[in-house]
Structure formats: structure tokens, C-alpha cells
């Protein structure tokens, strides 16, 4: 096994028992692939598939004019280059987007020609607005902020059958219904009512009998009955009534008469129930007809019109009920044979027949008019309008789209379903197999008559007791709409608006000689796109607290949003975990609160298929042997197979062991024999999402706490010095790399140069393309503000000279340590109560932790100020501010902007700004002063940007934006100059590195080669030496050497051209950058100048901050205790954190205890390694110890492949503690933890004996830091990875003396953002009442709240030194009086 450059630095010891069959896939693939499919930039114009933008254009174009003589055709589209790159867009507050241009062809037909003849074709490119581009990490930059488009889980188009579970009617009767849901267009519902009549609705409007719809589709009564019923024929004669014998129909019936065979023997006596044996006897007897009683005909319905063959008179119509009068009429007219509908109570109901009787419409036209009146009440139904509406509802491609998915779902549910033998022989089987044979193949993306009839038939068959209803929460009935599809829908809706406008103008296209770009206005398209990305419910401000929160946000799947559910209407079933979620959607990670179950996270291995359904991978099992073959199955496909769990036992050849294996089949857990198993899970962590799979020992935690643990990891604030978790799960590296926080090498090579801002790698010759100068430059992100104001900062993780392979770590980012996710710090933890400071989950923490900056985090705040053009004149950014103290002015430069590096506190001026004041009436004294001293500075008011309350920090960056045409101030100019200077240095460095690399390659290539001549009179045929090359005046003279080897000569020429291109490219880039910086900035209307000040705030850990482990064990820091008072071990080491042991049993998150034990072992092993290194032991001893660590149990590591230097580097990286991986559901067992504890703390070690371990090495003796005495009982001590969460007390603490008031009630506002007061509510009033504190209460309810006059009076009294209160009438009382008056009740106050 070979390790990469990064892996061998710190190998994580894994306890996994099963080898990894499938690598963790790229975690952002869903987003990136979806948008790539939408744009199709990689495909040539003619190779683009009908997806995304292409599909949207194809669905709207061609646009044909109303008269039909002009049409616009779509040829292809192109996307330009974005004007600004991503960081520039973020800085300027603009959208990272590219211009979209479509080539459109205008075709004008000849009006005079007898047949369609093209008269003229005009073609040009039309600008269609800007399309936001996705960043490489799967987000979008919209108006300067990073946003994520969350995927939506919605109901798949198709047909669904369900019942109301007996909730609608008091009797508890099941009412069946069906619904055809298109991707776009009207919904069609069919439903039974409690009387078993069948109705339909369009778009949830008024219900109408379903037979109206069938008549509107062109069926008459007789045809309707013919479709939905089997027939019975009765033969009438003077001897009685006979019917054709259909054996299958007799089962379970009671014989109305004696059934006799041909000899007259009784086969079934009258009144007896007919059994299966009786039916066999009847069939064997060869009977073809049965006698029936004439009375049994009564109540049956006729299947067809009965017409007298002689007179042509209609004796009875189809669906008429047979009565005695009708039978008598038949007798008189000599009717010998009648056909009725075969109806029984058990499995052939009279639903359609009864519905037809309630339907009064006569024929197709009347039925369509009835539908028109229901859809457009009050509008007169003209024949044309009626036809148009009916056809547009379900049969027009413009207004109805079932989509590819919808058609597939529809066909599988209706035409392609498996029928039982009884169904095959019934009307339903005939309908699907004969009448509608081939309907599934010709079905387009609109509904056909057959589709509607097949849906009704399936619903009737369900009511008859055949078939199953659908489960709408099954993931086979819910599909994912990702970014690409959501954007495509918005784009299409914008294009549809364009189409309406274009149609109006197309008629004038020829007469006015218009071109395509004159006809098309792209505003509606760009408005639709802008609205979607800017304010859609699914376009969300990206959660960027740490790399995990970024990844999880992009993998989120929401059931909310347009076309989805709403929180209020979503019931329990939709939110619940469903068996089909297995391996597709995480059962653990979902928010607490109103969104629980509606917002989910994709499982680690889940992906979407072409139809949008979620799939999960499985290993194929053949004859009990597990193969390496992997298939992705959707929820529908999975239902057909028997699937074993990932932890099923296998022998060395991969065969399933044991008589029975735990499996899943159709959502149920079963025990199956190995030969029945068809698939097996790929990994134990397949079920859960990324965040949940980061929790070690997840299998030992209660699900509710695991949910909290998964959610709280996303809120962890990046620490100043990230520290990898000692106990991880092995997926940390994937998260760090895929989130793009840590930088990995694009190509292998040698590290040429490293500083804090840049890493330069010279690419290996075999990975560089021919003639290309192979240098990769990685510019690192330094101290940048994230969306949540946390700090994004990348640190190089390599040294000059390191040899890297593709995918190796180049630089660490926020919350990553050696390319692994590191959200918190490893803390030594003791579980014990300590003076009540850990009551109710509080956390007692050592002062040493705060002093060592273990949990110190940097937060970057961005403060903006804009200078606008006001009616009274322009605002000015200046240093000249009235009444500003000298101390504050010293921080500002001559332009009035704070210096970088200045330490600022609340209230300090950051940017000086003055606003013109309106002309005020001057007093005579002021006039006199004006006359004496001339114009003064009093006609401006100070509107400077000041540091907000409760905030202090260091200014780390200032950006100044100036509108085009306005003089830049010195500060703005100096920022531009320094930026250009830095950029030029960057380019020069790059060119230098390119040059050096190129000439190194040339030297390796030509030294030792023969030359035909060259500079400094190089003789023909002489060999080129290093000395000769060194002696040339310039390295560029090397290109003048004429080589004998033509291939090498060509390569030399290529490198020369390549270098020249690089130089030209660098000059071009510099000019572009210069132009970007020196041209005016696009600012909002009326804004002349904008200044952004970035302030870095250091937040140390303090009491009130929220902290948590990874198991949902959260708490608030109650006290930071001096290190000398903390409980300490026998060797004098104090613990870092003291937690309450009572927080574990009731919460049932035992995983934290196992983590603590394994962490304790990791720390002990680290200490032993540290001791060995300090004692300078031989590499062989280290290798032997590491072998015991890595190859004792679990996954084996190949340490023999490492050199002694690599072993020493690995050991020194483990000094602080070994790295363990305990994968989810395949983690370390108790015995393995004991094994590690014994390795860390061997009993023969005297140091170990001193600590006072218990037998299992999990508890030690601790001493009280205050008294020095040992605690009575041994205490569980260990190491846990503990996180500091984003809920910091600094951001929540807030105090107010006076501040803003509400206009109506005159009471203080509430909340920190409004600088509000504390509400003294009803319960607090009771408390004061209980104590009888009358004066305090009076103050609270009047002067301190909303008694304006009393407040003013009290202030005056205090100023005068009179400490008394004159309380008046609270304003809220006046509001109450007004409220009562508004209800028409007069109320007056009588003052005494």
C-alpha cells in the first residue's frame, strides 16, 4: 500500500473491520453536475442535449407570428467571459455572471406564394441577459454575497392513487382518489364520494361527475359502459330465464335455483353457497347455461340500447335499470335476449353506472360546455372558446407538460403494471392489453384520451379491491429538483414572457425591416433569473461558519419552496423517516423546530439519477458471493431485491457466512438465507449524512442527541490554531478537501517557493503538456470575512523542495489541520460535579485553556458608509468634522478614513463624513457671530461611520469605491496603486518562475546534444555543454542554438513561443487589472462614494459562551477557573474541562464516554511517543511501537513502506496524541479500546502506577486544586474533541440606558439590533406586586417605560438635584383609549 505525501505525515489508525469498497464520492457533485448540465459549456453547439438552457430555448422557439408569415428560430447560444473574477465581485457587491447571447434567425415567408416559401432570412446574435456562474465550490456570488441554491424534494409528476384512510366520512369508509400531476399544467383529480359515485376536478375546483369528462372526450353512454364493465347475457323464453355460465363468477355466490347436470342430478342445491369443488363439478358436467329466477333480473342495468328490430323503436336505453314494467314490455315485444352489466357487491361495483345516472349532460358538446362553465364561471361559452379551453387543459404542449419523468411514472403505474389472472380475464385486462395496446409507447408529454381512461379504470379497479394504493412519502414518488432544473424553469418562464411580447411585433418585422435583436427584449429573462437567485425561498445565504456547514448546506434537500410543501400544512407522515430513505436521505440530520423532517441532508453515497430520483450504491451478490460490482439503485428498483447489511459476516473469499443473514426486502427487515441475497450495502456509514458520519461511536448515541450533535458541528467556530480530533471517523479528510477550504495540488510537482500568500509548484515533466511552461501557482486566501463573519485564512502546509503528487495537500484552511477537518480542540475532561458550577449542563473550564488561546477565534466585521448626493448638496467624506476630539482625529488619514492597523473601540470614528444641513432660522446672536467670523462649519452635520456599541478590534483592510467621473481622494488612489504594485510583483514573480523552469527544462533537454551552430561561433557538430550555456551573455541566446535533432529543435521553438505568450499574457493581464481598478465603480443610484472598513475582532473564550461535544452534549461556560483551583492528576497535570456526569445517563449519548476513553488512550500513546523521541530512541524501536499501535486490530497499515525519516516525521506528528478513526457503525469495540489503553498505560510503567488507575484504566485519582486532597472516588478522565459554537456571549450581551422608542406606544424597542430595552412583562409585575414594591413598580410602568411627560419631568428634577418622581399617564393607556374609540365606544377620563 502506498501513502501519499500528506497521508504518511499522520496516518489515522482505523478500527474498521471491513475494507472500503467504494471511496467517498465528491461531496458537491449534485450541485456542480446539475449546473454543468444546465449550461452545457463543454459540448459543441450541435452536440448539446435537450437539457437546461438548450431545452428552455427549444421549448419556446420557434415563435410564429399571429398571421403565420414570420417566425423566429433559435440556432444556438454562447456564454461570454465574466467581467470580474469571484473575489472582485464579492468586494464590489456585484453578481458573478456571464453574458448570454443567443443566435436567432428571423424567417419571413412570402405572403403571395401559394405554398409556404421563404422570402427572406435574417440572423444575428441577441443579448439575453446575464446568467450567474457557479463558483468551483458549488455556490453563487449574488450581489457580492455567496449564496447556495438548495435542491428541492417535490412530488414527482405522474399519476397517484390514494385513499383518505377513513378520515373523511363518519362511517370510516375508505374513499379512493387519483391525481394526475403534470410537471407544468392543470392537475386532474378523480375521487369517490361516500355514495360511491365517481367525480373529477380540474385544479381543485368544483367536482363534477366523471362521466361528463368521458363524454367530453367523445364517448357515449354505451361506449362508457362497454369500457368499464363485463357483460352478462340473459335468454328469455316461456320456460324461464337462462344465462351463459361463466364458472369464475359463481364462486362464493348462493345458488338461487337447483343446479342440475344433463342427467338431472343436483350438483348444487338451492340456497347453498357455491364452493370451488362445486365449480369443478359444474365445469366437468359440461354445462354452458344456467337457469336463473326471473326476479334476479330486477335491478340489473342494461349494457346497450334495446331496439325493436321491426319498428326501430328504442325499448330501453343503455344503463336503464330493469324493472317489472320493462320485463313486461320485453315480453310483449318478443325480446329473446338482453345484455346487462355484470355487477356484484364484492369486486365489480356499479360506480360508473350509478355516476352515469346522475349525469344530465347529453353528448360531447354539452359536456365540454359544462366543463367550460366550471373553469370560467360567468363567461359566455362560444363554441370556439369551449373547444380551445378543453384542448389547452391537457392536450396542448404549450400549456401542459407531463415531462419525461411524468410519462415514465404514468406508464409504469397504469399500462405496465402486473395484473393478476382474474384481472387479465376481466374488463380491466381487456382494456389495457387489447383496447389500449401500444398506448404506452406512443404517449407523449401531454395527456391522451387513453391516459385519462386508464387512470379512471385503475381507480375503479382499486375500489373493486384489486391493487394497492401509492405511498406518497416513498422516495420513488418524490424527486429532487437541483440547481440546474430550478434555474431552467425560471429561465423558461422569462422566455415565455418574451414570447408574448415578440408575437405582437412579429407581424411588423417585414414592413419595418426589423432584425431579431430589435424584436427581442431580454429584460423579462434577466428579471426572472435575478428574482430567482436574489429572493427565491430556495436561494439561501450560504452558511459559511466552517467547512462542514458549507458542504452540508450544498447537500441539503428541502421539501419547502415554490411548488413544494408549507410548514403549516406538512403533516407527521411527510416529516417522518421512511424505509426508502435508507442510503439516500439521512435519518438523523434535520433541523429541530418547525422544519423538522422537511429539510433533510443527502446521505454520503447518495446521488440523483437522470429522472431526478435518489439512488444509493449496492454491491452485487451472486449465489451468496459478494462481488466487487457496484450498482446504483433507486427506491423503486430497491423494492424488487433482497439486500444484506454492510456488517454481514463474510469469509476470506467474500462468501456470506451463516444460515441466515439480516436483510431488507420491500422496506421490511427480514432474515434470509445467503442464496436469496441479491445485493449488499457498500459501507456501514451509507445510511447517514456527512455531518452525522463525523460523529465517532454514533451507534452508541440516542438518535435525538445525534441529531443535535450533527447540527451543532455546523455551528463550530474556527479556532485560531485548528487541532485535528484525536478520535475521528476517517471521513474528515474528504470534507476538508471537497469543501475547497484546504487546497490540494492540481498536478504533481516540486514545491519551488512558499510564503504566507503563495505556493509555487514546478510541475513534473510527465504531467506538463508539451511546450507548456509547467508551473502551478496557488494564491492563498488571507484573513477574509465569511458570510457568518468568521475568518477564512489559508496556511501553507508544505516546504520548499517537497515532492507532491496530484491531490496532495498544499495549504490548510480555516478549521483544517493537515488536510483534515478540525472543528474544535482536544480537551482533557473529567466527569465530576464541582461546586455546582456544572449544574444543568454548565461547563467549568480552566483558565489555562483561555490563556493558551485554545478557543480564541477571529471574527471579521465589515462596516460600510456611503456618501450620497442629497437635495441640499453632496455628502462629503473628510477629516474635517465639527467637534471631533484630537484623539479620534489622529486615527484618520487626510482623506478622513481610518488607518489600517488602528485599534478601535466602540464609538470611534472610522470614516469621517459630513452631510449638509437644511437652512435653519438663525437667532440675532448667531447672525452677529456669522457677520464677525464669516462662513462657519455649522451648516453640516456629522454623519461619520462609528464603531458600533459593544465592539472593538483592529482595522485590517479598507476599500474605497468611487463613481465614474468623480475625483478620487488620496486614500483611494493609494489603495489602487498598492494593489497594482502587488499585482505587478505577482506577475513578475510568475514570469521569473516560468523563465527559470523553462530554461531548466531546456538545459536538461539540450545538454549533450549535437548542434549545427549557434551564438559565440559554436562549431557545427560540437556537443552542447553546461559551461557553454553558462558562458552565453543571456539565457535567451539559447534559442539561437541550431540543434541537429529536429524534434528537439521543434520543442525548443515551442518553449520560446510559450515564453513569449506568457510575457504578452502577463502584460495583457496587467492592463486588464489596471483598467478594472482605474475605471469608475458601479454604485447604486445617488451614491458618489462608498467606503468598506474591515475590522478583525479577537474573541477569547469567556463565561456565557456555548460549547458542545459531537454527541449533542452542549452546555454554557459557567466559570473560567484559575488553573491552580482545577482538579489535577497525581503527576500535577490539571484537567481542562469539568463536565457533569448526570448529563450522560438520561440523554443516552454513551458515545461521548467511549470517545473519552479512546481519546485518553490516544493521549497516552502520544506521550509515550514523545518520551521515546526525547530519549532519541532508534527508528527501529519507534517502528516496532507504531506497528503495535497500527497493526494490533482493525485495518492494517503498511509501515514497512516508510523510510526511517518518514517514520520519525510520523512519530513527531503524533506527539500530542495518536489519531484514531472509529467509522460509523464499524467502530472500535470495547475490547479494542482496552487494548489501546493498555498500550498507552502499561501496568509495568511506574508513571502509570502513580496516576492511580482503576483496573480498566478508565478512571484515575484526582486531587482538589484548592485543598490538595484526593477526591473520595476515582474519576473518569479522558480526552474529548470539544467545540466552541457560534452563539457567543459577546454577540448577545447588550445594555441600554436611553435609546429609540416606538412611535405609537412610546415604549422602548426590543432586541439588540434595535438597541432596545428589557421587557418588564406581566410575570415580572407579579413578582414586584408579591413583594409590595409599589414605587419600583410605578417607575417601571410609567417613567421607565412610556410616560413621556413624566420622563422629561424626572430628568429635570434630577438635574436640579431634586430626587422625586412626578408620574403621569402612560402612553399605552392613551393607545387603549383610542383602540376602544375605534370600536365605536366613547370613553372619557375624569381627573380627580
Swiss-Prot record:
InterPro entries xref list: DNA-dir_RNA_pol_bsu_ext_1_sf, DNA-dir_RNA_pol_bsu_external_1, DNA-dir_RNA_pol_su2, DNA-dir_RNAP_su2_dom, DNA-dir_RNAP_su2_hyb_sf, RNA_pol_bsu_bac, RNA_pol_bsu_CS, RNA_pol_bsu_protrusion
Quaternary state and interactors: The RNAP catalytic core consists of 2 alpha, 1 beta, 1 beta' and 1 omega subunit. When a sigma factor is associated with the core the holoenzyme is formed, which can initiate transcription.
Keyword Isomerase in annotation: no
Organism listed in the record: Neisseria meningitidis serogroup C / serotype 2a (strain ATCC 700532 / DSM 15464 / FAM18)
Keywords from the UniProt entry: DNA-directed RNA polymerase, Nucleotidyltransferase, Transcription, Transferase
Described function: DNA-dependent RNA polymerase catalyzes the transcription of DNA into RNA using the four ribonucleoside triphosphates as substrates.
Any one GO biological process: DNA-templated transcription
SUPFAM superfamilies cross-referenced by the UniProt entry: beta and beta-prime subunits of DNA dependent RNA-polymerase
Official protein name in the record: DNA-directed RNA polymerase subunit beta
Amino acid at each position: 500500500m502506498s501513502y501519499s505525501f500528506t497521508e504518511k505525515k499522520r496516518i489515522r489508525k482505523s478500527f474498521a473491520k471491513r475494507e472500503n469498497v467504494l471511496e467517498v464520492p465528491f461531496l458537491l457533485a449534485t450541485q456542480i453536475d446539475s449546473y454543468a448540465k444546465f449550461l452545457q459549456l463543454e459540448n459543441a453547439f450541435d452536440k448539446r442535449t435537450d437539457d437546461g438552457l438548450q431545452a428552455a430555448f427549444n421549448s419556446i422557439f420557434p415563435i410564429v407570428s399571429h398571421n403565420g408569415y414570420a417566425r423566429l428560430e433559435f440556432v444556438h447560444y454562447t456564454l461570454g467571459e465574466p467581467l470580474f473574477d469571484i473575489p472582485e465581485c464579492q468586494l464590489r457587491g456585484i453578481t458573478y455572471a456571464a453574458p448570454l447571447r443567443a443566435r436567432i434567425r428571423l424567417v419571413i415567408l412570402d405572403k403571395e406564394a401559394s405554398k409556404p416559401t421563404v422570402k427572406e432570412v435574417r440572423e444575428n446574435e441577441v443579448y439575453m441577459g446575464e446568467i450567474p456562474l457557479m463558483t468551483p465550490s458549488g455556490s453563487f456570488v449574488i450581489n457580492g454575497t455567496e449564496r447556495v441554491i438548495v435542491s428541492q424534494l417535490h412530488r414527482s409528476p405522474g399519476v397517484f392513487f390514494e385513499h383518505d384512510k377513513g378520515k373523511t366520512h363518519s362511517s370510516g369508509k375508505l374513499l379512493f382518489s387519483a391525481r394526475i400531476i403534470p410537471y407544468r399544467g392543470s392537475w386532474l383529480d378523480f375521487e369517490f364520494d361516500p355514495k360511491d359515485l365517481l367525480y373529477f376536478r380540474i385544479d381543485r375546483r368544483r367536482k363534477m361527475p366523471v362521466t361528463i369528462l368521458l363524454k367530453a372526450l367523445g364517448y357515449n353512454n354505451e361506449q362508457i359502459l362497454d369500457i368499464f364493465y363485463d357483460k352478462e347475457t340473459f335468454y328469455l323464453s316461456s320456460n324461464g330465464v337462462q344465462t351463459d355460465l361463466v364458472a369464475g363468477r359463481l364462486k362464493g355466490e348462493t345458488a338461487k335455483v337447483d343446479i342440475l347436470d344433463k342427467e338431472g342430478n343436483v350438483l348444487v342445491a338451492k340456497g347453498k353457497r357455491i364452493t370451488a369443488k362445486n365449480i369443478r363439478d359444474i365445469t366437468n358436467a359440461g354445462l354452458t347455461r344456467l337457469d336463473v329466477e326471473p326476479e334476479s333480473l330486477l335491478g340489473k342495468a342494461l349494457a346497450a340500447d334495446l331496439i325493436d328490430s321491426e319498428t326501430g323503436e328504442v325499448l330501453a336505453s343503455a344503463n336503464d335499470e330493469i324493472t317489472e314494467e320493462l320485463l313486461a314490455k320485453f315480453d310483449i315485444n318478443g325480446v329473446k335476449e338482453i345484455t346487462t352489466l355484470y355487477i356484484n357487491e364484492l369486486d365489480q361495483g356499479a360506480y360508473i353506472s350509478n355516476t352515469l345516472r346522475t349525469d344530465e349532460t347529453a353528448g360531447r358538446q354539452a359536456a365540454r360546455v359544462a366543463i367550460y362553465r366550471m373553469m370560467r364561471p360567468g363567461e359566455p361559452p362560444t363554441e370556439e372558446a369551449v373547444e380551445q379551453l378543453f384542448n389547452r387543459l391537457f392536450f396542448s404542449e404549450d400549456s401542459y407538460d407531463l415531462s419525461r419523468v411524468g410519462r415514465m411514472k404514468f406508464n409504469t403505474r397504469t399500462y405496465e403494471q402486473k395484473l393478476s389472472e382474474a384481472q387479465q380475464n376481466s374488463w380491466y385486462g381487456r382494456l389495457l392489453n387489447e383496447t389500449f395496446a401500444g398506448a404506452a409507447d406512443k404517449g407523449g408529454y401531454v395527456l391522451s384520451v387513453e391516459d385519462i381512461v386508464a387512470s379512471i379504470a385503475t381507480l375503479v379497479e382499486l375500489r373493486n379491491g384489486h391493487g394497492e394504493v401509492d405511498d406518497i412519502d416513498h422516495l420513488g414518488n418524490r424527486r429532487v429538483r437541483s440547481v440546474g432544473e430550478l434555474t431552467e424553469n425560471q429561465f423558461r418562464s422569462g422566455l415565455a414572457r418574451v414570447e408574448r411580447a415578440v408575437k405582437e411585433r412579429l407581424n411588423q418585422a417585414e414592413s419595418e425591416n426589423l432584425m431579431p435583436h430589435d424584436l427581442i427584449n431580454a429584460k423579462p429573462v434577466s428579471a426572472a433569473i435575478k428574482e430567482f437567485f436574489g429572493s427565491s425561498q430556495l436561494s439561501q445565504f450560504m452558511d459559511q461558519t466552517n467547512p462542514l456547514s458549507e458542504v452540508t448546506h450544498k447537500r441539503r434537500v428541502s421539501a419547502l419552496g415554490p411548488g413544494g410543501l408549507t410548514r403549516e400544512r406538512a403533516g407527521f407522515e411527510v416529516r417522518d423517516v421512511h424505509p426508502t430513505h435508507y442510503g439516500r436521505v439521512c435519518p438523523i440530520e434535520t433541523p429541530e423546530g418547525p422544519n423538522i423532517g422537511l429539510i433533510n441532508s443527502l446521505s454520503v453515497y447518495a446521488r440523483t439519477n437522470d429522472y431526478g430520483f435518489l439512488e444509493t450504491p449496492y454491491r452485487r451478490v451472486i449465489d451468496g458471493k459478494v462481488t466487487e460490482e457496484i450498482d446504483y439503485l433507486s427506491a423503486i428498483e430497491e423494492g424488487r431485491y433482497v439486500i444484506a447489511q454492510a456488517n454481514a459476516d463474510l469469509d476470506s473469499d467474500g462468501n456470506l457466512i451463516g444460515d441466515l443473514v439480516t436483510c431488507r426486502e420491500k422496506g421490511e427487515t427480514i432474515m434470509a438465507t445467503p442464496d436469496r441475497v441479491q445485493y449488499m450495502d457498500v459501507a456501514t456509514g451509507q445510511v447517514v449524512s456527512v455531518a452525522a458520519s463525523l460523529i465517532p461511536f454514533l451507534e452508541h448515541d440516542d438518535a435525538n442527541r445525534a441529531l443535535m450533535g450533527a447540527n451543532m458541528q455546523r455551528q463550530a467556530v474556527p479556532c485560531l490554531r485548528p487541532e485535528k480530533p484525536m478520535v475521528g471517523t476517517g471521513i474528515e479528510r474528504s470534507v476538508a478537501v471537497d469543501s475547497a477550504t484546504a487546497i490540494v495540488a492540481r498536478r504533481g510537482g516540486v514545491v519551488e517557493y512558499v510564503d504566507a500568500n503563495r505556493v509555487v509548484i514546478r510541475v513534473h515533466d510527465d504531467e506538463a503538456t508539451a511546450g507548456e511552461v509547467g508551473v502551478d501557482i496557488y494564491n492563498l486566501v488571507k484573513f477574509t470575512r465569511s458570510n457568518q463573519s468568521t475568518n477564512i485564512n489559508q496556511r501553507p502546509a508544505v516546504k520548499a523542495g517537497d515532492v507532491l503528487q496530484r491531490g496532495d495537500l498544499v495549504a490548510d484552511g480555516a478549521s483544517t489541520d493537515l488536510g483534515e477537518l478540525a472543528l474544535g480542540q482536544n480537551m482533557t475532561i473529567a466527569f465530576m460535579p464541582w461546586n455546582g458550577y456544572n449544574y444543568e449542563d454548565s461547563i467549568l473550564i480552566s483558565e489555562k485553556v483561555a490563556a493558551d488561546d485554545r478557543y480564541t477565534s477571529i471574527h471579521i466585521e465589515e462596516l460600510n458608509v456611503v456618501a450620497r448626493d442629497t437635495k441640499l448638496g453632496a455628502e462629503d467624506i473628510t477629516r474635517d468634522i465639527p467637534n471631533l476630539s484630537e484623539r479620534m482625529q489622529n486615527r484618520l488619514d487626510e482623506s478622513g478614513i481610518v488607518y489600517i492597523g488602528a485599534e478601535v473601540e466602540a464609538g470611534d470614528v472610522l470614516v469621517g463624513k459630513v452631510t449638509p444641513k437644511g437652512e435653519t432660522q438663525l437667532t440675532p446672536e448667531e447672525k452677529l457671530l456669522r457677520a464677525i467670523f464669516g462662513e462657519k462649519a455649522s451648516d453640516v452635520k456629522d454623519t461619520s461611520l462609528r464603531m458600533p456599541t459593544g465592539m472593538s478590534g483592529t482595522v485590517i483592510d479598507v476599500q474605497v469605491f468611487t463613481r465614474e467621473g468623480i475625483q478620487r481622494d488620496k486614500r483611494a488612489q493609494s489603495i489602487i496603486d498598492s494593489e497594482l504594485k502587488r499585482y505587478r510583483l505577482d506577475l513578475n514573480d510568475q514570469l521569473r518562475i516560468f523563465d527559470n523552469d523553462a530554461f531548466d527544462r531546456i538545459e536538461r533537454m539540450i545538454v549533450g546534444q549535437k548542434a549545427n551552430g549557434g551564438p559565440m561561433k559554436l562549431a557545427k557538430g560540437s556537443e552542447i555543454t553546461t559551461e557553454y550555456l553558462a558562458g552565453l551573455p543571456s539565457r535567451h541566446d539559447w534559442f539561437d542554438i541550431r540543434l541537429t535533432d529536429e524534434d528537439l529543435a521543434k520543442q525548443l521553438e515551442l518553449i520560446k513561443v510559450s515564453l513569449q505568450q506568457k510575457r504578452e499574457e502577463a502584460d495583457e493581464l496587467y492592463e486588464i487589472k489596471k483598467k478594472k481598478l482605474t475605471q469608475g465603480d458601479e454604485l447604486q443610484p445617488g451614491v458618489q462614494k462608498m467606503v468598506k472598513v474591515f475590522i478583525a475582532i479577537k474573541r477569547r473564550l469567556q463565561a456565557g459562551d456555548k460549547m458542545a461535544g459531537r454527541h449533542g452534549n452542549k452546555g454554557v461556560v459557567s466559570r473560567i477557573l484559575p488553573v491552580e483551583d482545577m482538579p489535577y492528576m497525581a503527576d500535577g497535570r490539571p484537567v481542562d474541562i469539568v463536565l457533569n456526569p448526570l448529563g450522560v445517563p438520561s440523554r443516552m449519548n454513551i458515545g461521548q464516554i467511549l470517545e473519552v476513553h479512546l481519546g485518553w488512550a490516544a493521549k497516552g500513546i502520544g506521550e509515550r511517543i514523545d518520551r521515546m523521541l526525547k530519549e532519541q530512541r532508534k527508528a527501529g524501536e519507534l517502528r516496532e511501537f507504531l506497528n503495535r499501535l497500527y497493526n494490533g486490530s482493525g485495518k492494517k497499515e503498511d509501515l514497512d513502506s516508510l523510510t526511517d525519516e518518514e517514520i520519525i516525521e510520523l512519530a513527531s506528528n503524533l506527539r500530542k496524541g495518536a489519531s484514531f478513526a472509529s467509522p460509523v457503525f464499524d467502530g472500535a469495540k470495547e475490547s479494542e479500546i482496552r487494548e489501546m489503553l493498555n498500550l498507552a498505560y502499561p501496568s509495568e510503567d511506574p508513571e502509570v502506577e502513580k496516576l492511580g488507575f482503576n483496573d480498566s484504566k478508565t478512571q484515575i485519582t484526582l486531587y482538589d486544586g484548592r485543598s490538595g486532597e484526593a477526591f473520595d472516588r476515582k474519576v473518569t478522565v479522558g480526552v474529548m474533541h470539544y467545540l466552541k459554537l457560534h452563539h457567543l456571549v459577546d454577540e448577545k450581551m447588550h445594555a441600554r440606558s436611553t435609546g429609540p422608542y416606538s412611535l405609537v406606544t412610546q415604549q422602548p424597542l426590543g432586541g439588540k439590533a434595535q438597541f432596545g430595552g428589557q421587557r418588564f412583562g406581566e410575570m415580572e409585575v407579579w413578582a414586584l406586586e408579591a413583594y409590595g414594591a409599589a414605587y419600583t413598580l410605578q417607575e417601571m410602568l410609567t417613567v421607565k417605560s412610556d410616560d413621556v411627560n413624566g420622563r422629561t419631568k424626572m430628568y429635570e428634577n434630577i438635574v436640579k438635584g431634586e430626587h422625586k418622581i412626578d408620574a403621569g399617564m402612560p402612553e399605552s393607556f392613551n393607545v387603549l383609549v383610542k383602540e376602544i374609540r375605534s370600536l365605536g365606544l366613547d370613553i372619557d377620563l375624569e381627573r380627580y
